[in-house]
Amino acid sequence: MANKLRNYTINFGPQHPAAHGVLRMILELDGEQIVRADPHIGLLHRGTEKLAETKTYLQALPYMDRLDYVSMMVNEQAYCLAVEKLVGIDVPIRAQYIRVMFAEVTRILNHLMGIGSHAFDIGAMTAILYAFRDREELMDLYEAVSGARMHAAYFRPGGVYRDLPDFMPKYEGSKFRNAKVLKQLNESREGTMLDFIDAFCERFPKNIDTLETLLTDNRIWKQRTVGIGVVSPERAMQKGFTGVMLRGSGVEWDVRKTQPYEVYDKMDFDIPVGVNGDCYDRYLCRMEEMRQSVRIIKQCSEWLRVNPGPVITTNHKFAPPKRTEMKTGMEDLIHHFKLFTEGMHVPEGETYTAVEHPKGEFGVYIISDGANKPYRLKIRAPGFAHLQGMDEMAKGHMLADVVAIIGTQDIVFGEVDR
């Protein structure tokens, strides 16, 4: 009697270099063809939602940076908008422009990392080197406004921590940098931060073209992405896909256009949409989104140059007074002390606030019972919905294509596991 053939079951991750963190998948294979892909999540669970419920509204803010740790300021933006909606704070218009500008800087940061690591996982090593060159300059912007290159905590309920600085930090000489290299590195750092941003926006589209030269018409890249991980528009909506995962399937849905927040209704930009819903279309959408982000950043920079003003609310029950005022005025000192010891008291109510995160729709749902801490804080992470589509997207493909599908989903486990 012949032995009955069984499918082969293997572990993918959590130590796999292409797992984008701590993804563990149980893969059932028929030969080298995927029969079932079962993602196991929770290995990076830190209880963020529960931790935030034990902290004041201001103390909970830095937890947002650590969710999707590639798109830090957009996480902060969603949280701040939710708190502002509950409290009813009017955010100064200059602060809104700064927020939108840094949200788009963050979108470019995310897509450079996503495309670079996706290509690297598939076998195209050069792209990530070009991507990280540009990411380095954008991380310098983060550092200049907040002092931190990743976990900025720059956005605050009511505005932003401080106005844009009048200068950009310069590289200093060392035994690794000669005078020629130093001059080249500091070339665009002679003026203000807005000058640096404008110079970046001038040269970055050419750098996107370089990335496209490496990948877009590359025969091997197309063989690894065209027709892989196809999702129909109907299934994308049924699965709760958002962002590029939805637009790549041909559904024109972008929260910045459909439900504008901050000053996105004043911005002129387009929404790139795919046709086939495969890995290649999603890659093209991300490339075009970076170009559109440059357009938005330019518009914000032009407006910020000619419109000075406050960058945080003057209601000191929700935002601290300036340090100079705090050291000279008794009322300001009391506000400062109360805000940082007791925290702000948010009126009773509940709100769901969503933003167009680089990975999709990132939502924050807050229930307030009138105390200085959230009664309940729920985070709607886009990657969580995308990962549940893994089984459907991978079924019938080869084992090597799993890596391409994980890369196109652009998953970060800080937000998936929370």
From Swiss-Prot:
Question: What InterPro entries does its record include?
Answer: NADH_Q_OxRdtase_suD, NADH_UbQ_OxRdtase_49kDa_CS, NDH1_su_D/H, NiFe-Hase_large
Question: Per its record, what are the GO molecular function terms?
Answer: NAD binding; NADH:ubiquinone reductase (non-electrogenic) activity; quinone binding
- GO cellular component terms, A-Z: plasma membrane
One matching Pfam family is Complex1_49kDa
Gene3D superfamilies in the cross-refs: Cytochrome-c3 Hydrogenase, chain B (1.10.645.10)
Q: What class of enzyme is it?
A: translocase
Catalysed reaction per UniProt?
a quinone + NADH + 5 H(+)(in) = a quinol + NAD(+) + 4 H(+)(out)
EC number of the protein: 7.1.1.-
Which subcellular locations apply to this protein? Cell inner membrane
Q: How does it sit in the membrane?
A: Peripheral membrane protein
Q: Which PROSITE patterns match?
A: COMPLEX1_49K
The region annotated as signal peptide is none
Task: Describe its assembly.
Answer: NDH-1 is composed of 14 different subunits. Subunits NuoB, C, D, E, F, and G constitute the peripheral sector of the complex.
- Which family does this protein fall into? Belongs to the complex I 49 kDa subunit family.
Per its database record, what is this protein's job? Answer: NDH-1 shuttles electrons from NADH, via FMN and iron-sulfur (Fe-S) centers, to quinones in the respiratory chain. The immediate electron acceptor for the enzyme in this species is believed to be ubiquinone. Couples the redox reaction to proton translocation (for every two electrons transferred, four hydrogen ions are translocated across the cytoplasmic membrane), and thus conserves the redox energy in a proton gradient.
Name this polypeptide is given: NADH-quinone oxidoreductase subunit D
Q: Which organism is it from?
A: Neisseria meningitidis serogroup B (strain ATCC BAA-335 / MC58)
